[in-house]
Every structure is written in structure tokens, then in C-alpha cells.
Regions:
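Flexible "arm" and connector segments at domain edges
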Residues: 1-52, 56-94
Length: 94
């Protein structure tokens, strides 16, 4: 079983898919995003990795509760950005 399936099963096993609220999962995503910002500010690579993983998990939770495919969402996002021509310069301008 791959990680996505294990994560999805975790949400199923805890009744989150059946009884969860999308807003609750969105709030968890926001909390984890705050932890990511803290990790970046502290230059803590381990905490950064943990936060990125947690954000991924909470976003999968949003999708499970809403009944949408996570990878379809990522595919949509990619198709929105794929033709953009911008480039981030060394001085931080885009």
C-alpha cells in the first residue's frame, strides 16, 4: 500500500471522511502552514519537513471529506501555471 492509500485509510478509520467537516481540515492546514513558517524562520530543516508532510496530509483530508481526487486538484493547479513565463531573479523579483 502506498503512502497516499495509507493516509486516506487513516482518515477513513477515524471517521473523518464520514463525519468530518471541510472547514476543520482547512483550519488544520492553516495551523500546519503556520508551523512551516515557524520552521523556515528558525531554519529548522527537520521541522520544515514535518510541516510539509503535515500540510500534505491535511490537504488530502480536505479532498477526502469533499469527495474530490487530490491528484485531480494538483493537475488543475499545474495546468494553471504550466504556461507562465515568469522567473524569480536573484534579487527576489518575479
Amino acid at each position: 500500500m502506498n503512502l497516499d492509500n495509507l493516509i486516506d485509510q487513516w482518515f477513513e478509520d477515524r471517521g473523518i471522511v464520514e463525519n468530518g467537516k471541510t472547514m476543520s481540515q482547512a483550519i488544520k492546514t492553516l495551523e500546519e502552514t503556520t508551523e512551516l513558517i515557524d520552521a523556515i524562520n528558525k531554519e529548522d530543516r527537520i521541522e520544515l519537513m514535518d510541516a510539509v508532510g503535515d500540510i500534505y496530509v491535511t490537504l488530502r483530508g480536505v479532498c477526502k471529506v469533499e469527495g474530490v481526487d487530490f491528484h485531480d486538484c494538483v493537475d488543475r493547479a499545474y495546468h494553471e501555471i504550466k504556461d507562465r513565463k515568469g522567473y524569480l531573479s536573484a534579487n527576489g523579483t518575479f
